[in-house]
Amino acid sequence: MVETMLNCDIKDIALAEQGKNNIEWALRDMPVLRSIQERFIKEQPFKGLRLSACVHVTKDTAALCTVMKAGGADAVLVASNPLSTQDDVAAGLVKYWGIPVYGYAGESVETYREHVRVALEHNPNIIIDDGCDIMATIYEEKPELAEHIIGSTEETTTGIIRLKALEEQGKLKAPAVGVNESLTKHLYDNRYGTGQSLFDGIFRAANILIAGKTVVISGYGWCGKGCALRAKGLGANVIVCEVDPLKALEAVMEGYRVMPIADAAKEGDIFIAVTGDKHVVDVEHLLNMKDGSFVGNCGHFDHEINVKGLREHAVEIKQIRPNLEEYKLDNGKSIYVIAEGRLVNLVAAEGHPASVMDMSFANQALGIEYLVKNQGKLPNKLLTLPEEVDIMIAKIKLDSM
């Protein structure tokens, strides 16, 4: 492996050796992605193409980027969250794989946005998005770049919502594959990955007992289902807040209590927002919570919990532990906010295990290949990968277990 130094904006290149070890450790547990990499090395499907990826900079996403580069892509990676970057991984990608990385843990929101603009300066043909940041920024700030784009893939429910809005407004100028719609993504990553990594983050941040607590889950999509399942397994009393009657009925059938967040606010001990929407846990809910309640977010953006509004009612904000703040409120209560209201599992922990991300990122890699192979033949709409791709990924995964 050749050591390389590139233009980048990372915390410390001296962390590269540990990052290399972590990336290789992740790849060890990603047999589907490894099999795709072997084929990409031979076929070079992305030779001559520029790739901009805006994803969480973790050992698992790094593995995906190395696979894309192995397939010939001229890749640039920027962080999709100001707090979730694993700095050793960023350094490892720069030094040992020659992939420029722009992102470091604790960067300001302004720096994060500038890094997204770096992805645009790469003038990409293909895009891997996590939250639709690159695509949305292109259409808002540099729509002329759209004519060079073959297509994009989107990892998250939140990003899918934004892409659907762009499509409805007639602004989507290139096909986009909604990876989140693939069965081998949302049935496993969203459910089993989110459920496990959420509580990994809570344990690291607060080290609290879950058994006997009342855990309130706002949102009962696949991520919410996974969070509720793991909370129940840990001995919690689970309340689900869900506006979709079909999903709410499913939650009831699973044995959970279902009620509006306004009612649940008075009963819960731990509150998790996992909807993809804004201010689902709003100021009035936060003020009505019991003294000593914990709140955390497992949706992509940090606006699901109205932390800004909560801050206006705080007489004191105290850092208790890394990734845990106590908000002493003007009503005499204290509320504990995990990871500043950003993604608990990626800020306070390391995200999902590599094994489950293996399938998600296989969909990303094959989604980009699908767009390239069908260039000029696909409508400028939000698309889903063909069923045979799901089946192939599932078969490879099963054979490895």
Feature locations, PLM:
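Rossmann-fold NAD(P) dinucleotide-binding segment
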Residues: 35-38, 69, 121, 135-136, ...
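Glycine-rich phosphate/diphosphate-binding loop of Rossmann-like nucleotide-binding domains
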Residues: 55-73, 185, 189, 193-279
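Short acidic, glycine/serine/threonine-rich loops at helix termini
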Residues: 64, 88-90, 114-115, 136-143, ...
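ADP-ribose/adenylate-binding Rossmann-like module
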Residues: 79, 126-131, 143-158, 277, ...
